[in-house]
C-alpha cells in the first residue's frame, strides 16, 4: 500500500484533477474511474466533488488510498497528454506538491518515487521541482504500514 492520504489531501488532489481549465474532462473521469474499478455513484455533481466522493468511498471501503494513486497514474499516462503538454506539466507539478507531503513524487516516466517528506507548504511547493529522479528510489507498493 502507498501512504494513507488524509481527506484534505484527497480533496486537494480531486480539485487538481477536476480543475476546469487544466483538469480532466467529465468523460475522461468516467473512463479512468472505470479502468481503476472505482465506483462512480456521483454523476451530475461537479467534477471535483464527484472525484472526492468516489475516492473517499473506495478508500474507506478498502481501508487504504491505493485507488487515488491508481487513478493518478492512469490520468497522467504520457499518451493522454501528447497534444497538451503544458496542461500536463502544470497538473503534474500540482499533484506532486500534494504528494510531497507523503514523501512521494510522480516522475516524468509516470512512476511514483520516494522523496524527502515535506512538512510545510513552502517545502511542498519546492520539493517536487528540485527532487532529482536519479537520486530518488522508486516507490514500492506494500512497503508502508
Residue ranges and their predicted role:
Residues 1-119:
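Charged interaction/catalytic cores of defense and host-pathogen modules
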Residues 105-145:
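Charged alpha-helical initiation segments
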Amino acid at each position: 500500500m502507498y501512504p494513507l492520504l488524509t481527506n484534505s489531501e484527497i480533496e486537494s488532489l480531486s480539485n487538481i484533477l477536476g480543475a476546469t481549465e487544466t483538469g480532466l474532462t467529465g468523460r475522461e473521469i468516467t473512463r479512468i474511474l472505470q479502468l481503476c474499478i472505482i465506483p462512480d455513484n456521483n454523476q451530475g455533481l461537479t467534477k471535483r466533488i464527484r472525484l472526492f466522493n468516489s475516492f473517499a468511498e473506495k478508500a474507506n471501503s478498502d481501508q487504504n488510498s491505493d485507488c487515488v494513486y491508481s487513478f493518478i497514474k492512469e490520468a497522467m499516462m504520457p499518451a493522454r497528454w501528447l497534444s497538451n503538454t503544458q496542461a500536463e506539466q502544470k497538473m503534474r507539478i500540482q499533484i506532486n506538491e500534494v504528494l510531497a507531503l507523503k514523501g512521494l513524487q510522480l516522475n516524468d516516466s509516470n512512476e511514483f518515487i520516494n522523496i524527502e517528506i515535506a512538512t510545510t507548504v513552502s517545502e511542498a511547493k519546492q520539493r517536487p521541482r528540485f527532487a532529482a529522479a536519479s537520486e530518488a528510489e522508486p516507490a514500492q507498493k506494500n512497503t508502508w504500514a
